[in-house]
Amino acid sequence: RCCPMPGCFAGPFCPCCPV
């Protein structure tokens, strides 16, 4: 699951969001 962040897109890898 990816967390929604400003300037960050929710993708399959979610590089901006910590897992």
Swiss-Prot record:
It is found in: Secreted. Its main location: secreted. One of its GO terms (cellular component) is extracellular region. Disulfide bonds join 2-16, 3-14, 8-17. The keyword Disulfide bond applies. The keyword Methyltransferase does not apply. The cysteine framework is III (CC-C-C-CC). Belongs to the conotoxin M superfamily. The precursor sequence of reg3l described in Franco et al., 2017 corresponds to the precursor of conotoxin reg12l (AC A0A2I6EDL5). This is Conotoxin reg3l. It comes from Conus regius.
